[in-house]
């Protein structure tokens, strides 16, 4: 059995006080997490990471991932698909294209409410491109927190951290200051989460 508690506890001390962009390497942190997982869990992690390759984001990918046994993968990529479709839908409206142009619509998927739709559309209406990207990533960040809210020391917790590391990695490239700030934010969240959940378990 994987020692998820040990892995989670070790995350804050990997690079806890880094302040220079060349010292914050999200991909290296993900690789360190992966090395500590079992082969089965590595496969699940790889499926999460596949979702960051635009060439793999096909109907078949979403069809399979939305039926995955892992709860984090199912909920995360349901949100991801809805957010992508909302973004495409907004652009279609702005460009006077057909509403469903370039959307990924799964025929077998039941119509579901997208709770973040209003927030996403409000962000997309912004005129500052960087602020729009930051706003959408804030939605993603909060979704990770929502999905893993009741998780303790398990694979879902680690997948959530990796999803946040991917957000950090993107901002280290777009805006290094924002990337470093997000990294420090995640370190503090890990510390707080670990302390709180450890206390809850021992009570």
Where are these regions (language model features)?
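Extended alpha-helical surfaces
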Residues: 1-203
């Amino acid at each position: 059995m994987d020692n998820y508690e040990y892995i989670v506890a070790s995350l804050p001390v990997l690079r806890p006080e880094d302040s220079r962009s060349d010292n914050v390497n999200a991909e290296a942190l993900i690789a360190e997490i992966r090395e500590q997982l079992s082969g089965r869990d590595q496969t699940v992690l790889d499926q999460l990471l596949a979702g960051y390759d635009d060439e793999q984001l096909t109907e078949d990918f979403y069809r399979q991932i939305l039926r995955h046994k892992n709860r984090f993968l199912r909920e995360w990529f349901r949100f991801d698909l809805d957010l992508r479709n909302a973004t495409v839908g907004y652009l279609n409206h702005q460009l006077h294209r057909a509403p469903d142009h370039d959307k990924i619509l799964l025929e077998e998927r039941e119509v579901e409410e997208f709770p973040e739709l209003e927030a996403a559309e409000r962000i997309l209406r912004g005129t500052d491109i960087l602020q729009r990207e930051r706003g959408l990533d804030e939605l993603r960040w909060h979704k990770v927190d929502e999905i893993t809210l009741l998780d303790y020391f398990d694979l879902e917790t680690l997948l959530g951290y990796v999803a946040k590391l991917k957000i950090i990695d993107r901002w280290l490239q777009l805006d290094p200051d924002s990337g470093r700030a997000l990294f420090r934010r995640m370190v503090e969240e890990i510390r707080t989460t670990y302390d709180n959940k450890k206390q809850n378990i021992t009570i």
